[in-house]
Structures are given as C-alpha cells and as structure tokens.
Amino acid sequence: MIDTEQVKKIAHLARLEITPEQEEQFTGQLSSILEYFDQLSELDTTDVPPTTRAIEIKNITRSDSMQPYPSREELLKEAPEQEGDFFKVPQILNTDEE
C-alpha cells in the first residue's frame, strides 16, 4: 500500500531524519493504518447523519457557590506575600503618568 520511497518523502517533508530501520518500521505501520482506512471506507453510512462526535456530549459544569473559608489567618499564612489582611501580588499595570 505504501513503500519506503513514499515514507522517505513524507519524512523529508516533515523534516525528519530517519534510519533505514525506521523506514521499514514506518512503512509497515503506515500500510496498516491505510488498510484500516480502506476497511472503514467500505462501511455503508447512507443512513448515518454526519456528525463531529460519536456521542452527544454537553459541557457539564457545577454551579459556583460562595462558601466562607474556615480560617482567614490560615489562608493568609499560605500567601507568599501579604499586606495587612490582603494578598500582595506583583503589579502588572503601569500606573506612571506621562
């Protein structure tokens, strides 16, 4: 189905350097993959509607709910830097006026 020359060309286009052993290995692997696609193309899909997924899925998310943290002090202890009762974070916006 695919020969070593085609594998060499694919490797060249992908800018891959492969050994002769890898050429043989990839020739066999790519031939198997292409044979599988041939088998799939023989399936009768006339009554199968086009789809992008095999199963219908939806984005399942949980609702957000606020819950108080048991200990504010313990939470602040975990911060790399703090200022009073707040986390101190690096400044990301330039506040210098020009």
UniProtKB/Swiss-Prot annotation:
Top-rank lineage group of the source organism: Bacteria
Enzyme Commission code(s) on record: 6.3.5.-
UniProt entry keywords in alphabetical sequence: ATP-binding, Ligase, Nucleotide-binding, Protein biosynthesis
GO molecular function term, any single one: glutaminyl-tRNA synthase (glutamine-hydrolyzing) activity
Reaction equation(s) it catalyzes: L-glutamyl-tRNA(Gln) + L-glutamine + ATP + H2O = L-glutaminyl-tRNA(Gln) + L-glutamate + ADP + phosphate + H(+); L-aspartyl-tRNA(Asn) + L-glutamine + ATP + H2O = L-asparaginyl-tRNA(Asn) + L-glutamate + ADP + phosphate + 2 H(+)
Pfam families recorded: GatC (PF02686)
GO biological process: glutaminyl-tRNAGln biosynthesis via transamidation; regulation of translational fidelity; translation
Assembly, per entry: Heterotrimer of A, B and C subunits.
UniProt family annotation: Belongs to the GatC family.
Protein's job: Allows the formation of correctly charged Asn-tRNA(Asn) or Gln-tRNA(Gln) through the transamidation of misacylated Asp-tRNA(Asn) or Glu-tRNA(Gln) in organisms which lack either or both of asparaginyl-tRNA or glutaminyl-tRNA synthetases. The reaction takes place in the presence of glutamine and ATP through an activated phospho-Asp-tRNA(Asn) or phospho-Glu-tRNA(Gln).
Name of the protein described by the UniProt record: Aspartyl/glutamyl-tRNA(Asn/Gln) amidotransferase subunit C
Natural source organism: Gloeothece citriformis (strain PCC 7424)
